[in-house]
């Protein structure tokens, strides 16, 4: 059983009057995140590459488009505070990537970064988007880099959040271990206790309001995390699921403006690795956001916006 509301067909569902939206606005007010009361907010589905994808649409379609790609084990809702703030100036599309959130799980368990990058390419075509900015966090950052390498003509600019061609093994191991230890729960409070212990940057109440987007309830009453765990398996032909991620030598050829955003206390993207990344790419700049770890946009939303908005506004 799903715990959150979303469109169950190809007709958009207006979420602007839903209690979930009221809860989000309450979180934004408590965190000092400004937003426009009139910003449009809808849940939508599309079918691309023979698979149903769910996404959240914010703002006016006549505004510049920003595509948001979430990290591993997360969903489009991980961007809600960011989307709410930006909706007055941008047409924001936050995609639930394959096997995540409210999108369909892939029948063949094909979850390489190359697969996901091709999904985004087809999503851009299906929505008729012209030169969007693509912003990806963690896994979504890898997808953004892969798309930038394969189809640089599709995007106006890219924002990479706490990810790069070099990552710290300790940081990625900590994430894998947390995910591996937290699969099913007797009740939502059990999951909440574990997330609060793991993520010291967000308040318990803020985390509580987002739980419904990360869990589903099975027929036996257990709560389980809402993503396809098969994606951790090795894909066909012996290719690891990270197949398709470009290296520094390939990224050096990227023609579009690139912003790298690092969490100041991140254990995934070290300061040295971030510096090597931007030094290798002539079009890249680096912004470090204090008081947050790997999940920059949710752990310090105001700081993330301070880093990203000037970059977006400067694109013209």
Regions found by a protein language model. Name each.
Residues 1-64, 88-90, 129-130, 309-316:
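Alpha/beta-hydrolase fold catalytic core
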Residues 2-23, 166-227:
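Helix-rich cap/lid subdomain of alpha/beta-hydrolase
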Residues 63-71:
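Short beta-strand element of the alpha/beta-hydrolase
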Residues 71-81, 92:
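Serine-hydrolase catalytic-loop signature spanning alpha/beta hydrolases and amidase-signature enzymes
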Residues 130-169:
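Conserved hydrolase catalytic core segment
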Residues 218-279:
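Conserved serine/cysteine hydrolase catalytic core
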Residues 292-305:
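Catalytic histidine-centered segment of alpha/beta-hydrolase-like enzymes
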């Amino acid at each position: 059983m799903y715990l959150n509301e979303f469109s169950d067909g190809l007709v958009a569902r207006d979420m602007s009057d839903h209690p979930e939206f009221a809860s989000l606005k309450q979180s934004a007010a408590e965190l000092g995140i400004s937003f426009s009361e009139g910003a449009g907010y809808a849940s939508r589905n599309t079918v691309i590459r023979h698979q149903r994808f769910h996404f959240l649409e914010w703002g006016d379609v006549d505004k510049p488009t920003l595509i948001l790609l979430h990290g591993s084990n997360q969903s489009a809702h991980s961007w809600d505070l960011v989307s709410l703030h930006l909706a007055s100036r941008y047409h924001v599309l936050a995609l639930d990537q394959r096997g995540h959130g409210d999108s369909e799980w892939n029948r063949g368990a094909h979850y390489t970064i190359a697969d996901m990058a091709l999904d985004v390419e087809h999503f851009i075509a299906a929505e008729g988007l012209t030169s969007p900015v693509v912003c990806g966090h963690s896994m979504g950052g890898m997808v953004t880099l892969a798309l930038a390498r394969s189809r640089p003509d599709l995007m106006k600019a890219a924002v990479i959040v706490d990810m790069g061609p070099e990552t710290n093994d300790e940081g990625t191991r900590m994430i894998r271990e947390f995910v591996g230890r937290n699969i099913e729960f007797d009740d939502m409070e059990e999951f909440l206790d574990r997330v609060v212990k793991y993520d010291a940057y967000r308040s318990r109440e803020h985390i509580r309001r987002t739980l419904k987007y990360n869990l589903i309830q099975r027929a036996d009453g257990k709560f389980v995390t809402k993503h396809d765990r098969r994606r951790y398996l090795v894909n066909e032909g012996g290719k690891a699921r990270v197949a398709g991620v470009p290296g520094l030598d390939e990224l050096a050829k990227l023609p579009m403006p690139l912003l790298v955003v690092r969490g100041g206390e991140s254990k995934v993207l070290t300061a040295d690795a971030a510096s090597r990344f931007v030094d290798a790419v002539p079009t890249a700049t680096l912004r470090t956001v204090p008081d947050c770890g790997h999940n920059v946009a949710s752990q310090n939303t105001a700081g993330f916006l301070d880093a990203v908005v000037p970059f977006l506004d400067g694109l013209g």
